[in-house]
Amino acid sequence: MFAWAPMTIGCLIHADEPVFADFPTSYHTDWQWWDILENAKVIEMQETPRELRPFIQVIDSFDNNEKLGIGFEARVGGGRLLVLAVDTRKKLDERPATRQLLESIDKYVRSDRFDPQVELDESFIRSFVR
């Protein structure tokens, strides 16, 4: 339809999720998300169970309309896993929004509220981890 390759058109942030309890956000990306998402990697999730809803969901172009995510949680191999596909190392001392998101995630995964409900096969995780 367009003269350029299809691309994503934004993110849907599930701000009501407890992972964001200590990170101010709306249901869409605001200014604080620029630094966080600048070097993020999108995970193709169309083969995952329908019930798995990424807490940071990438909105694909209408040409493709695939399920994409940057952050999600699941049960894998009897354990609990939270995946966040963003750069968490580069110049972190200069990135207050990223630090605050990581602090919120850390508090969440250490709490009793971290209880993923959807089971994923380990092969899915291996498909995007190098």
Task: Place the predicted regions along the sequence by residue.
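Catalytic beta-strand/loop cores that center a nucleophilic Ser/Cys/Thr
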Residues: M1-P96, R113-R130
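Short amphipathic C-terminal alpha-helix that caps PH/PH-like domains
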Residues: A97-V109
